[in-house]
Amino acid sequence: MDFIRMIEEEQMKKDLPAFRPGDTVRVHVKVVEGTRERIQAFEGVVIKMKGGGLRRTFTVRRVTYGVGVERTFPLHSPRIDRIEVIRRGIVRRAKLYYLRELSGKAARIRDRR
């Protein structure tokens, strides 16, 4: 068991910012198109964090042209270039699935000071 934990710790990223559900983040993802590789930003609200250790994932939601888009990222993925925390939000839940049903001003999240 120690051997598996040791290998996982080697592959974990150390330079990740602290964020939690309710925070607005910008995730810079490496995208491969043919032979070229570029970085694409995905900005939205973190609605869920799941798992632990190397298997930890988080889901980011944003609304684009009236359509809600959710994307789930492995936290320690080599495809993630960097994560920026734009705003910190106050929420009382760990999973913010209720935001899927809300739109406009009702979907706002208060700022943490």
From Swiss-Prot:
Entries under SUPFAM superfamilies matching the protein: Translation proteins SH3-like domain
A Gene Ontology BP annotation from the UniProt entry: translation
Matches recorded under InterPro entries: Ribosomal_bL19 (IPR001857), Ribosomal_bL19_CS (IPR018257), Ribosomal_bL19_sf (IPR038657), Translation_prot_SH3-like_sf (IPR008991)
GO molecular function, one term: structural constituent of ribosome
Keywords: Ribonucleoprotein, Ribosomal protein
Gene Ontology annotations for the cellular component aspect, listed alphabetically: cytosolic large ribosomal subunit
One Pfam family here: Ribosomal_L19
Superkingdom of the organism of origin: Bacteria
PROSITE patterns tied to this protein: RIBOSOMAL_L19 (PS01015)
HAMAP family documented for this protein: Ribosomal_bL19
Function, in words: This protein is located at the 30S-50S ribosomal subunit interface and may play a role in the structure and function of the aminoacyl-tRNA binding site.
Family: Belongs to the bacterial ribosomal protein bL19 family.
Descriptive protein name: Large ribosomal subunit protein bL19
